[in-house]
Amino acid sequence: MKSEHFKTELITNVSHDIKTPLTSIINYVDLMKKEKVDNKTVQEYITVLDRQSARLKKLIEDLMEASKASTGNIKVELEAMDATVMLTQVVGEFEERAKKNQLDIVVDSPEPPVKIMADGRHLWRVIDNLMSNICKYAMPGTRVYISLEKFNGMVIMTFRNISKSQLNISSEELMERFVRGDSSRNTEGSGLGLSIAQSLTGLMNGNFAIQIDGDLFKAILSFEEVF
């Protein structure tokens, strides 16, 4: 327990220390982008700096959030909300990205309202992480099935997709920090998305599970229904 606490504190402190100089780098890159630069090579350097600094910023933010979520050191405000509306809104944000990746999203959900107790900001992040994961790793030209159903007093959200490559990894390993299904590391990402989603779901008294069967990936969120 002490070891985990020390590791979490170290990650938080290091992330904070890196964030300060990174902010300066990002600000200077923004200033460089506003300058008129005729040299194409220099323009390309600025573009790479901009992209990679944004990537590093996202990684640091994920690190800090994963650290806080895993220890419960994060504010959670539960309130009754419509799971159907939340799911529809977040999935809608990914329509263009999914289309760009040649993915056909099929959503099956009952008419609202379907009420659960959750923190809107954290539930958004959980679904957002799952959709981001799908857009990165799903096989182009396939369908992504997302469903919301009520069963025995529970509200269950299920996300199913076919992976680009066979998932030679257990569901437990996939939810560990820094682990990615793409072992070749051909896609950008921190490997923290599923770990954060699992921790945040638990903090909202929900359940987060993953099932893997060959190249079939399934993520299941479940919360008690409220009336």
Predicted regions and their residues:
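Short beta-strand/loop element within the Bergerat-fold HATPase_c
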Residues: 141-153
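Conserved catalytic submotifs in the C-terminal HATPase_c
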Residues: 77-81, 99, 104-114
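A conserved beta-strand-to-alpha-helix junction within the catalytic ATP-binding
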Residues: 77-91
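Glycine-rich ATP-binding loops of the HATPase_c
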Residues: 205-214
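Short conserved segment of the HATPase_c
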Residues: 166-180
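Short helix-loop "hinge" at the ATP-lid/N-box region of the Bergerat-fold HATPase_c
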Residues: 134-135
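Conserved micro-motifs of the catalytic ATP-binding
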Residues: 71-76, 115-118
